[in-house]
């Protein structure tokens, strides 16, 4: 079977019997109650996936890997040029920390369905907070760290969180962004007030805590009893992610637990061709959909090691940073935005910095977030001598709409093309 035929046959198989296709994909997830029905077209506006099933997303992303004997594998590699720190967190360590933070949230009254706003920089505690919220069956809403107070206030007002998890500061090249004054102002502006605020005190700029409301995150986590995973319906919400709309009220994307877990787990092998134990790096931010899907959930659902990077493509300290991270940690797939590659290309057009590093373990570069100009793809292919895949999707979908699929064998494509539709999508051009 030729490589192109494997894509064609797989897409045709999905189109012929979508429910059978997704029933098979659903076998990659641990269910508390396995789905008997795959899709109910009559539920909701667009139909609902796995309407009779139950699971916990945190269990699937963390606990099951420990139970399967992968506890000593790295789950998260935190690499921060901003602090000069590299921290490796195994699946067993991640399970311990997530269970403890879930216990701290539960002790503060957070239960299934409650909302938790997370306003954090790119630190492991951001991912731990997301997973701890999911562990309780609660709903997280991550707001990009450093967003202005008015933007944060509108999201607090809309989501009505019982708790907020934040940090004292974020770090940008040449400056410290103090989060606490922004958070205090946002809470003052919002008609809804959280009952609990947990703050990660970063040594670069600790902040004063508001008595009676604020607590030290790490102190609260350390003092808590670990909490087990709470089973939720597949159709129950996992998170709200507000789109960066410029008009009117913020628009919240509400993601369910079941369909999300199945699609993201499936995408790791289908789209990116990675398997458990592989190192995967989405150079994005947890505040955006790429961060939700491909820094936190998909790599962990797939039993991979995910890189959580606090830095920039250039200036932290140089345009070789991305290649240094790939070499140091044995990254197999790098996923970033064309803007990042263009910034590197501008500062290092001949790849002088790139040539300093051993990129033998890197197998492909994936790009998304905006259309990629052909020059950037051709430049990347020439210097890396690896496949470069431009793929397209949206906050609303959470994973690939069109792309090229390493798990099926890459088909030939032209620079500037967004590829072909993923199984699950029937893409039609309606107008020239």
Protein language model annotation of sequence segments:
Residues 116, 133, 237, 243-246, ...:
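Conserved S/T- and glycine-rich ATP-binding loop of Class I adenylate-forming
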Residues 1-89, 93-96, 100-103, 182, ...:
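N-lobe entry segment of adenylate-forming
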Residues 120-134, 146-150, 284-302, 395, ...:
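Conserved coil-to-alpha-helix start sites within the AMP-binding
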